[in-house]
Amino acid sequence: MIRSYYLILIACLFTITDMNAQKTNLPIPVKIVAQQNGYILMRDGKPYFIKGAGGTSYTDRLVKYGGNSIRTWDTKNAMTLLNNANKLGVTVTMGLYVATERHGFNYDDTIAVKRQLEKLRIEVKKYKNYPALLIWGIGNELNLEYTNPNVWDAVNDIAKMIHDEDPNHPVTTMLAGLGKKEITYIKTRCTALDLISVQVYGKLANVPKELHANGWEGPYMVTEWGPTGHWEGGETAWKASLEETSSQKAAVYQSRYEASIKVDKHCLGSYVFLWGQKQERTPTWYGLFTENGEESEVVDVMQYLWNGVWPAIRAPHIDAVLLDNKKAADNIYLQPGKAYKVSFVATDPNKYPLTSRWELLPESTDLKNGGDRESRPQAIPSSITDITATGAVLHSPVKEGPYRIFIYILDGFNKVATANIPFFVKKDSK
């Protein structure tokens, strides 16, 4: 009798626990509503403008600075990520990995296409009820280096499948750029999509005008945007891309956002790239943070754009970086094994004393497209000496070839300014 009582009690406890788990694991409905002059995203019946970032690092800081959403490229660690996002009060645009033509997938292979759809169905059913889920993202830049338009039929079939399995969340696909051809394909062959997502860098300010010119009058979001891309700016005579300083990046992040995302009523929000750090051409090009977790001036800008308030402690500002009294765009050639002066001008808005960290790297040769993983070059030790408040001495490598010197200006409060200058070591240089 006593044993039966305990068994009933345990069963009741499990039932209550399961009910509580279900209460905390219910989907929050999200939908897009058309308005007279555009569109608005509604989450749980309330307007929701996406103030997001791409990446899963430093999400606590994103919340602290006014962000409300993160974006992923696949469902790796999705359960942990969604649960953590829910605890922090942020949402997730969940990427579904879809194979690309440029990596060898054949969209004429109907069996492989069907197999991929059914694999994605499992993922959708697994995560559709998590309250932090905001939007499903089908693939990433499927139009990059592609030739087969059948990919759009596959995208549409995936979108229809998602709507069948999950009526509570909108579906999009992420486009590299915003070409008229792709817009036409999507309007005619991807009618199950609820919105499109564009990924642009230097041309962000032109997005509203270009979308209109290319025939898109529906809702959209910007799922990647950031500095001038390595393919968009200047380069040296030896094809090394010229990177903006962190201060130059901060200026263009703000101006381009305010000219497009902030004012276009068809835009539902955005995900800045990248809320973290990665090696892509250089270790500093796209990440808003350094490898040590230090925050650049761009993070200050994002806090201002998200909530209208600048942080109390601002990042250092860097200007006028010179190597051998030349700018990065001057095609700097150095002789091997010689000493050269590097100078910079840096200021701190809070008047804090600044220090510097230096690094010399060979120019990266592991160059990929579409954000594919790249390896970081190994630093060359003992190359920078005589460090002062305004510069240092670079001892050029003995081996001929392309290199890049990096400068990190630190304020002691986890804020940083970054800059780099490419140069080429050549025996007969003057």
Task: Show which residues each predicted segment covers.
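Bacterial Sec-dependent N-terminal signal peptides
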Residues: M1-K23
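Active-site mouth of glycoside hydrolases
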Residues: P27, I32-Q36, I40-L193, A205-N206, ...
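Substrate-binding clefts and catalytic carboxylate motifs of secreted carbohydrate-active enzymes
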Residues: Q35, R43, P47-G52, H212-A389, ...
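Substrate-binding cleft/loops of secretory-pathway carbohydrate-active enzymes
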Residues: G177-P208, H230-A237, G276-P283
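Residue-level recognition of secondary-structure-to-loop junctions
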Residues: S396-K399
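C-terminal edge beta-strand
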Residues: A419-V425
